[in-house]
Regions:
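Short glycine-rich phosphate-binding loop at a beta-alpha junction
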Residues: 39-48, 72, 176-178, 279-285, ...
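Phosphate-binding and adjacent anionic-ligand microenvironments
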Residues: 236, 273-451
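Gly/Ser/Thr-enriched, mixed-charge loops and adjacent short helices
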Residues: 13, 107-232
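Short beta-strand-to-turn element immediately C-terminal to the catalytic PLP-Schiff-base lysine
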Residues: 111-114, 248-252, 332-334, 424
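Proline/glycine-rich low-complexity loops and linkers
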Residues: 125-161, 166, 252-324, 332-333
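N-terminal small/polar loop signature for handling phosphorylated ligands or for N-terminal nucleophile
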Residues: 32, 39-106, 192-250
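An N-terminal, well-structured beta->alpha segment
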Residues: 1-62, 66-68, 93, 149-177, ...
Length: 451
């Protein structure tokens, strides 16, 4: 069996790869693992708004209960809310049913330990072993009072909203904010948080129907938010993705701020307050050259990890650091939460705007972004490209043309059948041509996937 877990849990097309049967076996596996430490471990389960969410939720919960675990079902709730609530409410583990920014036919299942952290690779390997044993009917099947219970608690999202609001000391009274919920997990709690802080909130894409999550909206399709911010003469636009573990922002001029810019602003705020541990902010290999240059000029150090918020978090925990994240909008404030948190991130920036009494476009001026081109090549196979001499030669040629003023980065996606080609440097047209040349070669050598 191929490895089930990718960089963000188990993810795939529902009823093709991610079936109710697999969700059931994952539940049995997780309850078996956490049951080693405690009889009847209690899990918190949350989900996003996909049509398949309730089906997978039922199967996962049934699997947990069948080996003696207990379940509390929170319903639709952001991923970072589950991470926070597991820790704050004393659950033994958590599970989130979501495929984040992916389209609605996909879904996923990821687990958190009792401290609100995603599971390390070695634990996921153990879960995979238990999944195989469950499929072979080798795991225990208790009877009588050995079977677990299921409870429903739809109020837990309000605890999370209260937590996020109290991470800042500033009222947002007088601010006009356009909020794009991506028709996802924060469609209700996002507006609750912002209005609770005193902002005037204009909501878009907060009416999920099971099929419209991330559909031309949210952080992966931010154009509508840019238009809405200017139409409403708003101070700020906030876009979450489907599970609200990331956010991108739009300033009053309709310009987008990505994760690099957001975490740099927040890191500088913490530095000025004497709260930025080791004066260091953690990015990834995808972080813009301008991010590193600006941080250095502002007296901060930067570190780059592999792409994936789990790798950013791993480094932050290892070195006891405050802020890190990804260009895509995953920003982690480890003093507040244990995973990327879109709403928590957004309110930090809104508070900064109020405290400085400056528009976001001015605050964002601390960083000059280098032009960056990214092409996603949907391939038949995303393995083996590193050893392909033709692909390697194309990359070396492009790097030679950019010299010391730029860079080329090619990597396989951890969650989709994609190879990503990124180039960065001073000239947009040159970058586009270099990226396209490499992308075309990868498509020929790796085989283009069928649409």
């Amino acid at each position: 069996m191929a490895r089930l877990f990718g960089t963000d849990g188990v993810r795939g097309v529902v009823n093709e790869f991610l079936t109710p049967e697999l969700a059931y076996h994952l539940g049995r596996a997780a309850a078996t693992y956490f049951g080693k430490e405690k009889d009847h471990p209690t899990f918190l389960i949350g989900r996003d708004t996909r049509i398949s969410g309730s089906m997978l939720e039922s199967a996962l919960a049934s699997g947990i209960c069948s080996v003696g675990g207990n379940v509390v079902i929170a319903g639709v709730i952001p991923t970072p809310a589950v991470a926070y609530l597991v820790r704050q409410q004393g659950f033994d583990a958590g599970a989130v049913i979501s495929a984040s920014h992916n389209p609605y036919p996909d879904n996923g299942i990821k687990f958190f330990d009792g401290n609100g952290y995603k599971l390390p690779d070695e634990v996921e390997d153990q879960l995979e072993q238990y999944v195989r044993q469950s499929a072979d009917n080798e795991l225990p099947r208790p009877t009588g009072d050995g079977i677990g219970t299921i409870e429903y608690n739809s109020n837990l999202a309000h605890f999370y909203a209260h937590f996020v609001r109290h991470t800042i000391d500033t009222s947002l009274d007088g601010m006009t904010i356009v909020y794009d919920g991506a028709n996802g997990a924060a469609s209700s709690v996002g507006p609750e948080i912002l209005s609770g802080l005193g902002a005037k909130v204009i909501n878009i894409n907060v009416n999920p129907d099971g099929l419209n999550i991330n559909d031309h909206c949210g952080s992966t399709h931010i154009e509508g938010l840019q238009v809405a911010v200017q139409q409403h003469n708003a101070d700020l636009g906030i876009a979450n993705d489907g599970d609200a573990d990331r956010c991108l922002l739009v300033d009053e001029k309709g310009q987008v701020l990505d994760g690099d810019q957001i975490m740099l602003l927040c890191a500088l705020k913490l530095k000025e307050e004497g709260k930025l541990k080791d004066d260091t902010v953690v990015g990834t290999v995808m972080s813009n050259i301008g991010f590193h240059k600006a941080a250095e000029e502002l007296g901060m150090k930067t570190v780059s990890t592999a792409v994936g918020d789990r790798y950013v978090l791993e480094y932050m925990r290892e070195h006891n650091l405050s802020v890190g994240g990804e260009q895509s909008g995953h920003v982690i404030f480890l003093d507040h939460n244990t995973t990327g948190d879109g709403m928590l991130t957004a309110v930090q920036v809104a508070a900064l705007m109020k405290e400085k009494n400056q528009p976001l476009s001015e605050l964002a001026g601390i960083m000059t972004k280098y032009p960056q081109v990214l092409i996603n090549v949907r391939v038949a196979t995303k393995t083996g490209w590193e050893d392909n001499d033709i692909i390697k030669a194309a990359i070396v040629t492009a790097e030679g043309e950019l010299g010391d003023e730029g860079r080329v980065l090619v990597r396989a996606s951890g969650t989709e059948p994609l190879i990503r080609v990124m180039a960065e440097g001073p000239n947009q047209e040159e970058l586009q041509a270099l990226c396209q040349e490499i992308a075309d070669i990868i498509g020929r050598e790796q085989g283009l996937a069928e649409k």
